[in-house]
Every structure is written in C-alpha cells, then in structure tokens.
Amino acid sequence: MPPPNTLSSLHRDLFDLGLRADMTVMVHSSLGRVGWTVGGPVTVIRALLGAIGTAGTLVMPTESPHVSDPSTWNDPRVPPEWYETIRENLPVFDPLTTPTTMGAIAEAFRTFPGTRRSNHPLVSVCANGRRAEEITKHHALEFCEGQGTPFEKLYDLDA
C-alpha cells in the first residue's frame, strides 16, 4: 500500500506534473483518485494553491445540476410523482450556499477563504487567486460554457 499523501508530497507531485508559480489552472479532481491524503481535500487545495503561488489562479468547476427541473435529472432519478413537490420547494441558486456535486475537493474549494464563485446556477466555477474576480465576474446564462463565460476567460488566459 502506498504511503498517504501529505502537503509536501503533493507539492512535489504537482511540480512533477508541471504546475508552476503564476499559472492559471482549471482542476477537475477526484479525492479517491488522488489517494488517501492527510488533511483530506483541504490539503489538496493548499497544495494546488501553493504550487501556483500568489500570482497564480486556481479554478474548479462547481456545477449544481440539482438546481433544475427534476424531470431532466438522470442522477439521481426521482419518481415523476415527486416532480411538483420538488419544483415548489427547490431552493434557488445562491453562489454562497448552494453546494456543488463535483466532489469533495471542489466542495471544499467552494468554501475556501478567498474563493469566488460565478453566478451561473447550473455550471458555475470557483476561482481563488490573482485573477479570481476577473474569471468569475460575469457568467452569461445563455451560453453557459462559451462566450461571455469564465470558460472563455480561461481560454483567453491559455489556462
């Protein structure tokens, strides 16, 4: 069995993967794939932020597909007889409180000090670092992953 990940071992691994200070990076993550980590998702986030430094920006998807019509849900499917109850009682999207379904690391990142979240109710992103405000400031509703979104900004930044 491999040893547990630590902040310093993750720093080395991220350096070996090519992360450097001043980078803007978007990270899709799985704590299970990272492996057992001392300190859990917070250690992974600290390692990522440490790798890119104060001049870098870390971005993660923080989608919340459950803030939608339940008849379109695939995971989890709910019985059709529940649709109306869910529609009438589903809380509205709030960037500060609506959880993400993108995993433990993304959920911890969403609430990490200094992290900002875009305002799209289904496909928001969170960012922390020098360009966080610039990346999350405007997120068009019509084209959720195209022009006028954080994804366009990431493309323009060669992230």
List the model feature ranges, each with a label.
Residues 1-159:
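N-terminal and secondary-structure boundary signal
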